[in-house]
UniProtKB/Swiss-Prot annotation:
UniProt membrane topology term: Peripheral membrane protein
The protein's name: A-type ATP synthase subunit E
Subcellular location: Cell membrane
GO biological process, one term: proton motive force-driven plasma membrane ATP synthesis
């Protein structure tokens, strides 16, 4: 729930920057091919006296090398684009707790974490600032909602403040089950799908 919203939101925010980088890469590819065609044409004329067959072979070799070089360059720029986009996503991730809808995202991550461990007596771990967002009345409402959904008594007790960007960590009282829905852990778990989504959007 919350994880999908996070990844979709920050990928969308980074899209414009990545498209610009890709456009530059495509322009460079065209420049490589154009230069190669000009070089091939010049060499073809220079060796024309040696025979038409030799000239054609030289031209084809130059063009093949140019296409290979252009393809390699495009692949390098594609990976560069993905890496730069991921860096932008990480920057946006740090800023996410400052956004107006962050509390809604946090609540969804908490609910997802409670589902993951199956309810019951739980410990809720947040960073210091997020503990201020989740007051006692909000905590009580969450407990009631989860009890109704899981058909199981659920108690959320605030634990110690953690050094995380945002999101939450949910633990069962006996420590046997842990759901790490911190923003950084959520991002890391979804990294492969984020990369695939970036590639799909841009290429």
């Amino acid at each position: 729930m919350g994880a999908e919203k996070i990844t979709s939101k920050i990928v969308e925010d980074a899209n414009k920057n990545a498209e610009k980088i890709l456009a530059e890469a495509l322009n460079e590819k065209e420049a490589i091919l154009t230069e190669a065609k000009e070089e091939a044409s010049k060499k073809e004329q220079a060796i024309a006296k040696k025979g038409e067959k030799d000239a054609e072979m030289t031209k084809n070799r130059i063009l093949a090398e140019a296409r290979l070089s252009a393809k390699k360059k495009l692949l390098e720029e594609r990976e560069k684009t993905i890496q730069l986009t991921l860096e932008k996503l990480e920057e946006d991730l740090v800023k996410l707790p400052q956004k107006e809808d962050y509390k809604d995202i946090l609540l969804k991550l908490i609910i997802s974490g409670v589902y993951s461990v199956g309810g019951g007596e739980l410990e809720l771990l947040l960073n210091k600032k997020d503990f201020e967002l989740i007051d006692d009345s909000t905590l009580w409402a969450l407990e009631k909602e989860m009890e109704d959904r899981l058909k199981k008594v659920t108690v959320l007790k605030k634990g110690e403040a953690k050094s995380i960007i945002g999101g939450c960590i949910i633990k069962t009282a006996d420590q046997t089950k842990v759901s790490d829905n911190s923003l950084e852990a959520t991002f890391e778990r979804n990294l492969d799908s984020v990369r695939a989504k970036i590639a799909e959007m841009l290429f």
